[in-house]
């Protein structure tokens, strides 16, 4: 499979303004046939299609790996890691291992998102997507257990179409490490469909309880008990929350890919610096491809930034899969069925979304930006056009960091026709000072876009008029349908002094609990 490059630079998540040398992956830039392209030091001949390893990939050999000299391997005789398939998987690469739901496999090597495994039934070996399996006898094999999901995402999933009264999940507690919470779909005549949460407490002997009068030695027993009757809960437990099969991980070792591996099928839109296409990668994976106009950025600067963008992985950020580094540069990302949030809000479906859903979109974006903030990164071009929407109405942030490497004066100079003046903080317009706090200003404008269903900010005003108005202290007025509390967040985002603007972490906490701030998020013991 060739050598893989891992991010060994502890400075990967870096300070707000970075030195020109960016990225975690050491690449060489070669001149071949007049074209500059990048390859790692272990790549094949420059004349055949080049696949360069993922900069985020790491190898962790399993206890059953044959290489006994590999650091980190367990002593001989250590227990095998046996996993069970949670879903069916049909091999799409020649080194993959197909399996059916319920099949058991022994893990030979844990390497990023693809693990090498051997089927216990067929003895065949190959790579398996790690998010399709779970350790045998672990809670993850239970259909009602949702690992690593937040309280807010539990509510989003339980309230999604297809679930019913009493649909439930058990998840890891966000606040108490090693503890669990039970989330149940309920109905309230005042609020409509709602979700109630119960803390699952632990006994000294390892048992579990919600109410001290009913204790259980396992979570399975607890679930069985509350399926028979509600016994103080809001509802009797009915069926586990519906869950869709997770996205397959991107192909192993395919970071810099040849253009021939992509078939562009449908043009989805055109922006200032190129086009966006729906495409198929290697005849098997649907993706989105952003094609950049030649000359819009330097290949070296783009690749360095892309190597860092690749390490920023979060549910509310669009997944960056791969790049084509010969001009025209291609950026390959996950496909988002509903397109940009701006287009969605203006569509028939989007324009019918009620205010609570608009607040939920805002909370999802704030969550993604809180992650970017925590990683000391900056977006630089946050607006509804750069948020993408999935089929299940999950909002994800796109194009983070891309503005940094654009070399078009029309975009980089404040007088330029493409410079997004109406979204840009005054200190970034006047002094080129882009920080996470200038992103917070842009988020305030994005909130206004959302609550007005995609209306252009500062309607009727030209860019120079906006700059002059801001200097006089003007701020957009509150739209009729906008709650005071939401407008207050916008006004805090638009404070003149960057340090007085809130953090994204704070904004997320307010938006997550916009309708529940006055009541406890967890039910009292029944």
Curated annotation (Swiss-Prot):
Cellular component terms per the entry's GO annotation: caveola; cell projection; cytoplasmic side of plasma membrane; cytoskeleton; cytosol; focal adhesion; Golgi apparatus; intracellular membrane-bounded organelle
Chain positions with Phosphotyrosine modification: 51, 209, 411, 522
Induction: Up-regulated during myeloid cell differentiation. The highest levels are detected in fully differentiated phagocytes. Up-regulated by IL2.
GO molecular function, one term: phosphotyrosine residue binding
GO biological process: cell adhesion; cell differentiation; cell surface receptor protein tyrosine kinase signaling pathway; cytokine-mediated signaling pathway; defense response to Gram-positive bacterium; Fc-gamma receptor signaling pathway involved in phagocytosis; inflammatory response; innate immune response-activating signaling pathway
Impact noted for substituting residue 290 to E: Loss of kinase activity
Protein name as annotated: Tyrosine-protein kinase HCK
Record's disease association: Aberrant activation of HCK by HIV-1 protein Nef enhances HIV-1 replication and contributes to HIV-1 pathogenicity. Aberrant activation of HCK, e.g. by the BCR-ABL fusion protein, promotes cancer cell proliferation.
Sequence ranges assigned to domain Protein kinase in this UniProt record: 262-515
Reaction equation(s) it catalyzes: L-tyrosyl-[protein] + ATP = O-phospho-L-tyrosyl-[protein] + ADP + H(+)
CDD domains reported for this sequence: SH2_Src_HCK (cd10363)
InterPro entries: HCK_SH2, Kinase-like_dom_sf, Non-receptor_tyrosine_kinases, Prot_kinase_dom, Protein_kinase_ATP_BS, Ser-Thr/Tyr_kinase_cat_dom, SH2, SH2_dom_sf
Keywords, ordered alphabetically: ATP-binding, Cell junction, Cell membrane, Cell projection, Cytoplasm, Cytoplasmic vesicle, Cytoskeleton, Exocytosis, Golgi apparatus, Host-virus interaction, Immunity, Inflammatory response, Innate immunity, Kinase, Lipoprotein, Lysosome, Membrane, Myristate, Nucleotide-binding, Nucleus, Palmitate, Phagocytosis, Phosphoprotein, Proto-oncogene, SH2 domain, SH3 domain, Transferase, Tyrosine-protein kinase, Ubl conjugation
Biological role stated in the UniProt entry: Non-receptor tyrosine-protein kinase found in hematopoietic cells that transmits signals from cell surface receptors and plays an important role in the regulation of innate immune responses, including neutrophil, monocyte, macrophage and mast cell functions, phagocytosis, cell survival and proliferation, cell adhesion and migration. Acts downstream of receptors that bind the Fc region of immunoglobulins, such as FCGR1A and FCGR2A, but also CSF3R, PLAUR, the receptors for IFNG, IL2, IL6 and IL8, and integrins, such as ITGB1 and ITGB2.
EC code(s) of this entry: 2.7.10.2
Statement: the UniProt record of this protein carries the keyword Lyase: no
Subcellular location, principal: cytoplasm
Lipidation (N-myristoyl glycine): 2
PROSITE patterns: PROTEIN_KINASE_ATP, PROTEIN_KINASE_DOM, PROTEIN_KINASE_TYR, SH2, SH3
Pfam families in the record: PK_Tyr_Ser-Thr, SH2, SH3_1
Domain description: The SH3 domain mediates binding to HIV-1 Nef.
Annotated family: Belongs to the protein kinase superfamily. Tyr protein kinase family. SRC subfamily.
Residue span(s) of domain SH3: 78-138
């Amino acid at each position: 499979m060739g050598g893989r490059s891992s991010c060994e630079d502890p400075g990967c998540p870096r300070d707000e303004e970075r030195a020109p040398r960016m990225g975690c992956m050491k690449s060489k830039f070669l001149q071949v046939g007049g074209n500059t392209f990048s390859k790692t030091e272990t790549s094949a001949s420059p004349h055949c299609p080049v696949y360069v390893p993922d900069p985020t990939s790491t190898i962790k050999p399993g206890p059953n790996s044959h290489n006994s000299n590999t650091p980190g391997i367990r002593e001989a005789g250590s227990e095998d890691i046996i996993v069970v398939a949670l879903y069916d998987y049909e091999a799409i690469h020649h080194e993959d291992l197909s399996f059916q739901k319920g099949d058991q496999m022994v893990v030979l090597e844990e390497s990023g998102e693809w693990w090498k495994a051997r089927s216990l039934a067929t003895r065949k070996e190959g790579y398996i997507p790690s998010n399709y399996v779970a350790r045998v006898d672990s809670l993850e094999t239970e259909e009602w257990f949702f690992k690593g999901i937040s309280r807010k995402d539990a509510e989003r999933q339980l309230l999604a179409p297809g679930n019913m009264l009493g649909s439930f999940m058990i998840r890891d507690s966000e606040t108490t490490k090693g503890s669990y919470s039970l989330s149940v779909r309920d109905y309230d005549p005042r609020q409509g469909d709602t979700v109630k949460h119960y803390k699952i407490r632990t006994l000294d002997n390892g048992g579990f309880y919600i109410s001290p009068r009913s204790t259980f030695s396992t979570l399975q027993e607890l679930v069985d008990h509350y399926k028979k009757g509600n016994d103080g809960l809001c509802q009797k437990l009915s069926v586990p929350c519906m869950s869709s099969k997770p996205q397959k991980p991107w192909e192993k070792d395919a970071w810099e890919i040849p253009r021939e591996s992509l078939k562009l099928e449908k043009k989805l839109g055109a922006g200032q610096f190129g086009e966006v296409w729906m495409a198929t990668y290697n005849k098997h994976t649907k993706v989105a491809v952003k094609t950049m106009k030649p000359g819009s950025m330097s290949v070296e600067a783009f690749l360095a930034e892309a190597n860092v963008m690749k390490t920023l992985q979060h549910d509310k950020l669009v997944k960056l899969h791969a790049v084509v580094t010969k001009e025209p540069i291609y950026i390959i990302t996950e496909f988002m069925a509903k397109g940009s949030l701006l287009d969605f809000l203006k569509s028939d479906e989007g324009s019918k979304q009620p205010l609570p859903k608009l607040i939920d979109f805002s909370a999802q974006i704030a969550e993604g930006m809180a992650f970017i903030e925590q990683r000391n990164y900056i977006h630089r071009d946050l607006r509804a056009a750069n948020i993408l929407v999935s089929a299940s109405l999950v909002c994800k942030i796109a194009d983070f960091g891309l503005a940094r490497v654009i070399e078009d004066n029309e975009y980089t100079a404040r007088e330029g026709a493409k410079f997004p003046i109406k979204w840009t903080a005054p200190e970034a317009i006047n002094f080129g000072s882009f920080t996470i706090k200038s992103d917070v200003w842009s988020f305030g404008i994005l909130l206004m876009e959302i609550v007005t269903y995609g209306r252009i900010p500062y309607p009727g005003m030209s860019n120079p008029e906006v700059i002059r108005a801001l200097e006089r202290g003007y701020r957009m007025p509150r739209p009729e349908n906008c709650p005071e509390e939401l407008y207050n967040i916008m006004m805090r985002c638009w404070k003149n002094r960057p340090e007085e603007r809130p953090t994204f972490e704070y904004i997320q906490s307010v938006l997550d609990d916009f309708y529940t701030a006055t009541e406890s998020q967890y039910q009292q013991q029944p």
